[in-house]
Protein backbone atom coordinates (compact mmCIF):
# COMPACT_ATOMS: atom_id res chain seq x y z
CA UNK A 1 0.00 0.00 0.00
CA UNK A 2 1.46 3.35 -1.05
CA UNK A 3 2.35 5.81 1.70
CA UNK A 4 2.12 9.49 0.74
CA UNK A 5 4.52 12.04 2.20
CA UNK A 6 3.25 15.30 3.67
CA UNK A 7 4.49 17.37 0.73
CA UNK A 8 3.21 14.91 -1.87
CA UNK A 9 -0.03 15.32 -3.83
CA UNK A 10 -2.50 12.58 -2.94
CA UNK A 11 -3.70 10.52 -5.87
CA UNK A 12 -7.34 9.68 -5.22
CA UNK A 13 -8.33 6.45 -6.97
CA UNK A 14 -11.26 5.43 -4.76
CA UNK A 15 -8.86 3.21 -2.82
CA UNK A 16 -10.10 1.83 0.51
CA UNK A 17 -7.20 3.18 2.58
CA UNK A 18 -4.82 6.14 2.30
CA UNK A 19 -1.69 6.41 4.44
CA UNK A 20 0.07 9.72 5.13
CA UNK A 21 3.59 9.81 6.58
CA UNK A 22 3.63 12.74 9.00
CA UNK A 23 7.16 12.17 10.29
CA UNK A 24 5.80 12.91 13.75
CA UNK A 25 4.09 11.30 16.70
CA UNK A 26 1.26 13.73 15.97
CA UNK A 27 -1.45 12.71 13.53
CA UNK A 28 -2.33 14.78 10.47
CA UNK A 29 -5.36 16.29 12.21
CA UNK A 30 -3.18 17.60 15.05
CA UNK A 31 -0.62 18.99 12.62
CA UNK A 32 -3.35 20.60 10.53
CA UNK A 33 -4.33 22.77 13.49
CA UNK A 34 -1.13 24.81 13.13
CA UNK A 35 -0.39 24.64 9.40
CA UNK A 36 -2.81 25.96 6.77
CA UNK A 37 -1.29 23.85 3.99
CA UNK A 38 -1.67 20.67 6.04
CA UNK A 39 -5.19 21.72 6.95
CA UNK A 40 -5.97 22.01 3.24
CA UNK A 41 -4.55 18.52 2.68
CA UNK A 42 -6.59 17.14 5.58
CA UNK A 43 -9.77 18.77 4.25
CA UNK A 44 -9.02 17.38 0.79
CA UNK A 45 -9.12 13.91 2.33
CA UNK A 46 -12.43 14.73 4.03
CA UNK A 47 -13.93 16.10 0.81
CA UNK A 48 -13.00 12.85 -0.92
CA UNK A 49 -14.85 10.92 1.81
CA UNK A 50 -11.90 9.64 3.86
CA UNK A 51 -11.92 9.47 7.66
CA UNK A 52 -8.87 9.44 9.94
CA UNK A 53 -8.97 6.22 11.96
CA UNK A 54 -5.47 5.48 13.31
CA UNK A 55 -1.97 6.89 13.75
CA UNK A 56 1.09 4.74 14.36
CA UNK A 57 4.79 4.78 13.41
CA UNK A 58 4.53 8.41 12.29
CA UNK A 59 1.81 7.48 9.80
CA UNK A 60 -1.83 8.64 9.78
CA UNK A 61 -4.27 6.15 8.32
CA UNK A 62 -7.47 7.13 6.53
CA UNK A 63 -10.34 4.90 5.43
CA UNK A 64 -13.00 5.49 2.79
CA UNK A 65 -16.21 6.11 4.76
CA UNK A 66 -18.11 3.30 3.05
CA UNK A 67 -15.57 0.81 4.43
CA UNK A 68 -15.26 2.01 8.05
CA UNK A 69 -17.53 -0.81 9.23
CA UNK A 70 -14.46 -3.06 8.93
CA UNK A 71 -12.84 -1.04 11.72
CA UNK A 72 -15.67 -1.45 14.22
CA UNK A 73 -15.36 -5.10 15.30
CA UNK A 74 -16.12 -5.47 19.00
CA UNK A 75 -17.67 -2.01 19.36
CA UNK A 76 -21.25 -3.29 19.63
CA UNK A 77 -22.44 -1.08 16.77
CA UNK A 78 -25.45 -1.74 14.56
CA UNK A 79 -25.22 -0.64 10.93
CA UNK A 80 -28.07 0.72 8.83
CA UNK A 81 -26.78 1.67 5.38
CA UNK A 82 -23.87 3.95 6.36
CA UNK A 83 -25.23 4.95 9.78
CA UNK A 84 -23.89 3.30 12.94
CA UNK A 85 -25.58 3.22 16.32
CA UNK A 86 -25.82 1.37 19.62
CA UNK A 87 -29.17 0.09 20.80
CA UNK A 88 -29.87 -0.96 24.38
CA UNK A 89 -33.05 -2.25 25.97
CA UNK A 90 -34.44 -1.77 29.47
CA UNK A 91 -33.01 -4.21 32.00
CA UNK A 92 -34.15 -5.63 35.35
CA UNK A 93 -36.22 -3.20 37.38
CA UNK A 94 -36.39 -0.84 34.41
CA UNK A 95 -38.75 -3.26 32.62
CA UNK A 96 -42.47 -2.63 33.10
CA UNK A 97 -44.76 -4.47 30.71
CA UNK A 98 -47.79 -2.55 31.98
CA UNK A 99 -46.67 0.67 30.30
CA UNK A 100 -45.86 1.43 26.68
CA UNK A 101 -42.39 0.88 25.28
CA UNK A 102 -40.44 4.09 24.76
CA UNK A 103 -37.37 5.16 22.80
CA UNK A 104 -34.81 7.88 23.44
CA UNK A 105 -32.61 8.74 20.46
CA UNK A 106 -29.31 10.28 21.58
CA UNK A 107 -27.15 12.30 19.20
CA UNK A 108 -23.48 12.34 20.26
CA UNK A 109 -21.87 15.33 21.96
CA UNK A 110 -18.47 16.71 20.99
CA UNK A 111 -15.45 14.90 22.46
CA UNK A 112 -13.65 16.29 25.49
CA UNK A 113 -10.40 18.23 25.15
CA UNK A 114 -8.15 15.19 25.67
CA UNK A 115 -9.74 13.21 22.85
CA UNK A 116 -10.82 16.08 20.61
CA UNK A 117 -8.20 15.36 17.94
CA UNK A 118 -7.74 11.67 18.66
CA UNK A 119 -7.00 9.55 15.57
CA UNK A 120 -9.65 7.04 16.67
CA UNK A 121 -13.12 7.34 15.16
CA UNK A 122 -15.17 6.43 18.28
CA UNK A 123 -13.29 9.04 20.35
CA UNK A 124 -14.32 11.81 17.95
CA UNK A 125 -17.69 10.57 16.72
CA UNK A 126 -19.29 8.66 19.61
CA UNK A 127 -17.59 9.76 22.85
CA UNK A 128 -19.00 8.54 26.18
CA UNK A 129 -22.02 10.53 27.31
CA UNK A 130 -24.41 9.97 30.22
CA UNK A 131 -23.81 6.21 30.14
CA UNK A 132 -26.15 5.63 33.09
CA UNK A 133 -28.90 7.91 31.81
CA UNK A 134 -31.49 5.13 31.80
CA UNK A 135 -31.26 4.83 35.61
CA UNK A 136 -32.80 8.30 35.89
CA UNK A 137 -35.53 7.82 33.30
CA UNK A 138 -39.00 6.30 33.51
CA UNK A 139 -39.30 2.57 32.85
CA UNK A 140 -39.41 0.69 29.56
CA UNK A 141 -37.06 3.02 27.67
CA UNK A 142 -34.93 1.73 24.80
CA UNK A 143 -31.86 3.82 23.97
CA UNK A 144 -30.46 4.47 20.49
CA UNK A 145 -27.08 6.28 20.43
CA UNK A 146 -26.14 7.43 16.93
CA UNK A 147 -22.50 7.86 15.92
CA UNK A 148 -21.76 10.98 13.86
CA UNK A 149 -19.78 9.02 11.26
CA UNK A 150 -18.68 11.65 8.78
CA UNK A 151 -15.74 13.89 7.86
CA UNK A 152 -13.44 14.86 10.77
CA UNK A 153 -15.48 15.30 13.96
CA UNK A 154 -18.79 14.38 12.41
CA UNK A 155 -20.91 16.93 10.53
CA UNK A 156 -23.37 17.37 13.42
CA UNK A 157 -25.64 14.90 11.59
CA UNK A 158 -26.02 17.23 8.58
CA UNK A 159 -25.51 16.45 4.88
CA UNK A 160 -22.07 17.21 3.49
CA UNK A 161 -20.68 17.48 -0.02
CA UNK A 162 -19.15 14.01 0.34
CA UNK A 163 -22.25 12.48 1.98
CA UNK A 164 -25.38 14.13 0.54
CA UNK A 165 -27.70 11.34 1.77
CA UNK A 166 -26.60 11.48 5.40
CA UNK A 167 -29.73 13.13 6.80
CA UNK A 168 -32.02 10.74 4.94
CA UNK A 169 -30.11 7.69 6.17
CA UNK A 170 -30.17 8.95 9.77
CA UNK A 171 -33.92 9.46 9.63
CA UNK A 172 -34.47 6.08 7.98
CA UNK A 173 -32.35 4.37 10.65
CA UNK A 174 -34.45 5.92 13.43
CA UNK A 175 -37.73 4.99 11.77
CA UNK A 176 -36.44 1.48 11.19
CA UNK A 177 -35.59 1.03 14.88
CA UNK A 178 -38.88 2.51 16.04
CA UNK A 179 -40.95 0.29 13.76
CA UNK A 180 -38.96 -2.85 14.55
CA UNK A 181 -39.52 -2.23 18.26
CA UNK A 182 -43.19 -1.41 17.61
CA UNK A 183 -42.98 1.90 19.48
CA UNK A 184 -45.54 4.62 18.85
CA UNK A 185 -44.24 7.97 17.64
CA UNK A 186 -45.64 9.74 20.70
CA UNK A 187 -43.33 7.61 22.88
CA UNK A 188 -40.08 8.71 21.20
CA UNK A 189 -37.78 11.55 22.30
CA UNK A 190 -34.75 12.98 20.49
CA UNK A 191 -32.00 14.25 22.80
CA UNK A 192 -28.58 15.80 22.39
CA UNK A 193 -26.05 18.26 23.77
CA UNK A 194 -23.91 20.69 21.72
CA UNK A 195 -23.23 18.88 18.41
CA UNK A 196 -25.85 16.35 19.47
CA UNK A 197 -28.24 19.18 20.27
CA UNK A 198 -27.93 20.35 16.69
CA UNK A 199 -28.67 16.86 15.42
CA UNK A 200 -31.59 16.43 17.81
CA UNK A 201 -33.36 19.69 16.98
CA UNK A 202 -32.62 19.44 13.25
CA UNK A 203 -33.97 15.91 12.84
CA UNK A 204 -36.55 16.31 15.60
CA UNK A 205 -38.15 19.15 13.68
CA UNK A 206 -37.68 17.45 10.30
CA UNK A 207 -39.59 14.36 11.45
CA UNK A 208 -41.68 16.14 14.12
CA UNK A 209 -40.65 14.22 17.25
CA UNK A 210 -40.48 15.28 20.87
CA UNK A 211 -37.05 16.84 21.34
CA UNK A 212 -34.68 18.20 23.98
CA UNK A 213 -31.64 20.04 22.61
CA UNK A 214 -29.08 21.44 25.07
CA UNK A 215 -27.08 24.46 23.83
CA UNK A 216 -27.20 23.18 20.24
CA UNK A 217 -24.60 24.33 17.71
CA UNK A 218 -27.10 25.92 15.35
CA UNK A 219 -24.58 27.86 13.28
CA UNK A 220 -20.93 27.22 12.40
CA UNK A 221 -20.41 30.42 10.40
CA UNK A 222 -19.76 34.05 11.25
CA UNK A 223 -18.63 34.62 14.82
CA UNK A 224 -18.95 30.89 15.49
CA UNK A 225 -16.54 29.83 12.76
CA UNK A 226 -13.62 29.94 15.22
CA UNK A 227 -10.94 29.47 12.56
CA UNK A 228 -12.86 26.48 11.23
CA UNK A 229 -12.14 24.57 14.44
CA UNK A 230 -14.77 21.97 13.58
CA UNK A 231 -13.22 21.53 10.10
CA UNK A 232 -16.56 21.83 8.34
CA UNK A 233 -16.23 25.07 6.37
CA UNK A 234 -17.20 24.48 2.77
CA UNK A 235 -18.36 20.92 3.50
CA UNK A 236 -21.90 21.66 4.75
CA UNK A 237 -24.34 24.53 5.25
CA UNK A 238 -23.41 26.86 8.10
CA UNK A 239 -26.76 27.98 9.48
CA UNK A 240 -29.40 25.47 10.60
CA UNK A 241 -31.87 27.97 12.05
CA UNK A 242 -33.82 28.73 8.83
CA UNK A 243 -34.37 25.01 8.21
CA UNK A 244 -35.43 24.35 11.81
CA UNK A 245 -37.91 27.24 11.71
CA UNK A 246 -39.27 26.08 8.36
CA UNK A 247 -39.70 22.55 9.71
CA UNK A 248 -41.76 23.62 12.73
CA UNK A 249 -43.85 25.92 10.55
CA UNK A 250 -44.79 22.89 8.44
CA UNK A 251 -45.44 20.40 11.26
CA UNK A 252 -45.15 20.74 15.03
CA UNK A 253 -47.46 18.31 16.79
CA UNK A 254 -44.89 17.20 19.38
CA UNK A 255 -43.21 19.38 22.00
CA UNK A 256 -39.65 20.58 21.50
CA UNK A 257 -37.38 22.27 24.05
CA UNK A 258 -34.03 24.05 23.79
CA UNK A 259 -31.90 24.75 26.87
CA UNK A 260 -29.38 27.59 26.50
CA UNK A 261 -27.79 30.32 28.62
CA UNK A 262 -27.33 34.04 28.15
CA UNK A 263 -23.91 33.55 29.80
CA UNK A 264 -22.73 31.95 26.55
CA UNK A 265 -23.71 34.77 24.17
CA UNK A 266 -22.51 33.34 20.84
CA UNK A 267 -24.65 30.22 21.19
CA UNK A 268 -27.46 32.02 23.00
CA UNK A 269 -27.85 34.49 20.12
CA UNK A 270 -28.45 31.60 17.73
CA UNK A 271 -31.02 29.94 20.01
CA UNK A 272 -32.84 33.28 20.26
CA UNK A 273 -33.36 33.15 16.48
CA UNK A 274 -35.47 30.01 16.87
CA UNK A 275 -39.25 30.44 16.58
CA UNK A 276 -40.08 30.43 20.30
CA UNK A 277 -43.79 30.27 19.59
CA UNK A 278 -43.23 26.76 18.25
CA UNK A 279 -40.21 25.63 20.31
CA UNK A 280 -39.79 26.33 24.03
CA UNK A 281 -36.43 28.06 24.57
CA UNK A 282 -35.22 28.05 28.18
CA UNK A 283 -32.56 30.56 29.22
CA UNK A 284 -30.68 29.14 32.22
CA UNK A 285 -29.39 32.02 34.35
CA UNK A 286 -26.51 30.60 36.38
CA UNK A 287 -23.15 32.16 37.27
CA UNK A 288 -21.61 28.68 37.23
CA UNK A 289 -22.14 28.66 33.46
CA UNK A 290 -19.31 30.61 31.83
CA UNK A 291 -18.77 28.69 28.57
CA UNK A 292 -20.53 26.40 26.10
CA UNK A 293 -19.27 23.10 27.63
CA UNK A 294 -20.65 24.13 31.04
CA UNK A 295 -24.28 24.48 29.99
CA UNK A 296 -25.09 20.77 30.04
CA UNK A 297 -23.39 19.72 33.33
CA UNK A 298 -25.05 22.63 35.13
CA UNK A 299 -28.55 21.77 33.92
CA UNK A 300 -28.73 18.00 34.46
CA UNK A 301 -31.75 18.07 36.85
CA UNK A 302 -33.68 20.24 34.42
CA UNK A 303 -32.77 17.95 31.53
CA UNK A 304 -33.93 14.86 33.40
CA UNK A 305 -37.16 16.57 34.39
CA UNK A 306 -37.89 17.50 30.77
CA UNK A 307 -36.89 14.10 29.38
CA UNK A 308 -39.12 12.25 31.84
CA UNK A 309 -41.97 14.63 31.14
CA UNK A 310 -41.62 14.08 27.39
CA UNK A 311 -41.27 10.30 27.74
CA UNK A 312 -44.12 9.82 30.20
CA UNK A 313 -46.51 12.56 29.20
CA UNK A 314 -46.86 13.36 32.90
CA UNK A 315 -46.79 17.05 33.81
CA UNK A 316 -47.65 18.59 37.16
Task: Name what the model sees in each region.
Residues 12-101:
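A domain-start/cap signature at the N-terminus of enzymes
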Residues 192-204:
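Glycine-rich nucleophile elbow surrounding the catalytic serine of serine-hydrolase chemistry
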Residues 222-294, 309-313:
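The feature captures the conserved acid-bearing segment of alpha/beta-hydrolase catalytic domains
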Residues 77-141, 145, 149-153:
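Short, surface-exposed "cap/lid" segments of acyl-processing enzymes
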Residues 298-316:
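Catalytic active-site module of serine/aspartate enzymes centered on a nucleophile-bearing elbow/loop
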Residues 157-181:
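Alpha/beta-hydrolase active-site loop
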Residues 182-194:
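Alpha/beta-hydrolase fold nucleophile elbow
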Residues 213-223:
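Active-site nucleophile loop of the alpha/beta-hydrolase fold
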Amino acid sequence: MKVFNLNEDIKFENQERILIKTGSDKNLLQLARKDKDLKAKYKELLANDYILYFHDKETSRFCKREHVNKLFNGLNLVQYKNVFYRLSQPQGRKVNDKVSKKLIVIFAKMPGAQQYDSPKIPHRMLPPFFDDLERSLVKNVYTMRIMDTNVSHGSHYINTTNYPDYEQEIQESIENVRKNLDIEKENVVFYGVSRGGAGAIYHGTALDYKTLAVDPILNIGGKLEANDRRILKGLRINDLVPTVNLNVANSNKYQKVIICSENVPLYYEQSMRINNEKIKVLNMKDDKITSHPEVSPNTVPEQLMILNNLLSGISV
